[in-house]
A protein has these predicted regions:
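Positively charged n-region of N-terminal signal peptides that target proteins for export
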Residues: 1-4
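Bacterial N-terminal signal peptides
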Residues: 8-16
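Sec/Tat signal peptide C-region and signal peptidase I cleavage site
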Residues: 18-22
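Primary mode marks residue(s) on the alpha4-beta5-alpha5 output face of response regulator receiver
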Residues: 23-169
Length: 169
């Protein structure tokens, strides 16, 4: 009897999770389709994204992972989120000055968020940024992250090149 109950419970949990997982996968596909053109930085700039290097610097957390340079489209900071139209693009900064699109960041200004009902995307809730006034979610759709697709730091992203300003320092 216990075994049958356990099987039914697992099956019920699986069936309940399947739509969210499927929705998350279709949103990842939408994100990839909507941002593929931004591998060329000129397309990102033409679409309203701009570098945050002078304002925020490059993001890294030695021993945990990199986050790179963010290109922000301030016009998208409107409280809505769409998988194929992220508020920020995340680029790995290479020592030779080249930028490589590695991920996306979705941001909602904190004043537009009810903390008891945070924004969601990919079947996951956003979390508050520890310093900046935003609720955020990263999606490492262009560089696999062994820590998880939606973790903040990616150990597969290089740390900031020497001489580049680093956020928080």
């Amino acid at each position: 009897m216990r075994k049958a109950f356990a099987v039914i419970t697992v099956l019920a949990l699986f069936l309940a999770a399947t739509p969210a997982m499927a929705g998350g996968q279709s949103a990842v596909k939408e994100a990839r389709q909507g941002t593929a053109k931004f591998h060329q930085i000129s397309h990102a700039e033409a679409s309203g994204y701009g570098s945050t290097l002078d304002l925020l610097g490059c993001f890294e957390n030695p021993g945990v992972g990199g986050m790179g340079l963010h290109y922000l489209n301030a016009g998208l900071l409107d409280g809505t989120v769409e998988a194929g139209e992220p508020e920020a693009l995340v680029y790995e900064m290479r020592a030779d000055g080249q930028l490589k699109l590695v991920g996306l960041e979705y941001l909602v200004p904190a004043e537009l968020v009810d903390p008891t009902n945070p924004p969601q995307l990919f079947g996951r809730h956003f979390h508050p940024h520890p310093i900046l006034p935003f609720w955020i979610m990263h999606a490492w759709i262009w560089r696999p992250n062994p820590s998880g697709m939606f973790m903040d730091w990616n150990p597969n992203v290089a740390l900031c090149p020497e001489g580049v300003p680093v956020f928080g320092s």
